[in-house]
Design a protein with these regions (language model features):
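N-terminal accessory regions of S-adenosyl-L-methionine
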Residues: 1-125, 173-196
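Conserved class I S-adenosyl-L-methionine
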Residues: 129-139, 157
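Conserved SAM-binding loop of SAM-dependent methyltransferases across substrates and taxa
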Residues: 140-152
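Conserved SAM-binding loop
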Residues: 169-170
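S-adenosyl-L-methionine
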Residues: 173-232
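A short SAM/SAH-binding and catalytic strip from SAM-dependent methyltransferases
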Residues: 240-253
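A short glycine-rich, Lys/Arg-flanked "PGG" loop and its adjoining helix->strand segment in the class I
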Residues: 255-266
Length: 266
């Protein structure tokens, strides 16, 4: 997790440097009213970046002192998808989508439908008394947690190749207080913002308290190899149900991978 923390903090530092460079351009504006407005906006952006840095400290720990900041990102991977999902913007936006009230309102119906389909599948195939459900590409863990809550008799395994996403998932699942963190998910995205305030938008996470869930839930979060659904140590454990969302582009042959881990009657 140290390498991930270092990379994410560096990306946040790079964003801060870019905003500071914008401040230098603002200072050269001749129009006093516009300059004052842009100066206030720039200061608000810097404050939000610093607030996000504090959230990174909470999620991943502080960066080593020698790593702050640099314009060269150290996170190098041979897997394109790992690069994407370990990125700072991806971490913030997945966190907002899955664990804020505003984001989850758009996912609630989909997650409920997937959970219902899993339940129906388990009933119709009459698996063992302790069925196993695999959720590859689980990201920040919201769907995996909801499935585990809805099916306490099942063993739920969420996997993701991104250590950054799993770091968020583990922290969210341990939270016992809703709204314990506030994030600004769109600071690095200056496009598609109709107003100054939309880029500065702050969202409270999580919207629920997963850490207060019943202790009898069986939920594991694991990191497989980049081309696998499950770690090699768990490959022999075939699954009764494989359920995934936003994952079809992450494996060379998704169907073959699903067949390899699916139970014969699953």
């Amino acid at each position: 997790m140290g390498a991930v923390a270092r990379a994410l903090h560096r990306q946040n530092g790079w964003l801060r440097q870019n905003i500071e460079l914008e401040a230098q351009s603002i200072a050269s504006l001749s129009a006093g009213q516009l300059r004052a407005r842009m100066t206030r906006y720039n200061a608000a952006l810097l404050a939000a970046v610093d607030a996000n840095a504090s959230v990174l400290d909470t999620l991943y720990g502080p960066p080593p002192s020698w790593s702050w900041p640099t314009l060269t990102l150290p996170w190098q991977s041979t897997d394109r998808n790992v690069d994407i999902y370990n990125g700072l913007g991806s971490v913030w936006r997945h966190l907002a989508k899955d664990w804020s009230a505003e984001g989850h309102s758009g996912m609630r119906d989909l997650n409920a439908r997937l959970t219902s389909m899993i339940s129906d599948e388990l009933r119709s195939n009459a698996p063992s008394s302790s069925p196993t459900v695999l959720l590859p590409g689980c990201g920040t863990g919201r769907l995996a947690w909801e499935v585990a809550c809805a099916l306490p008799e099942a063993s739920v395994i969420g996997t993701d190749v991104s250590e950054a996403q799993l770091g968020v998932a583990r922290h969210m699942l341990a939270c016992t207080e809703p709204g314990s963190l506030t994030v600004h998910p769109w600071l690095d995205e200056s496009r598609n913002n109709a107003t100054d305030q939309s880029r500065l938008a702050a969202l409270a996470v999580p919207d629920v308290a997963p850490g207060a869930a019943p202790a009898n839930l069986s939920l594991q979060l694991v990191q497989p190899g980049a081309a696998r659904l499950v770690p090699a140590s768990a490959a022999a454990q075939q699954m009764d149900v494989v359920c995934t969302c936003f994952f079809l582009d992450c494996l060379p042959d998704t169907l073959a991978a699903v067949r390899a881990v699916r139970h014969a009657r699953g």
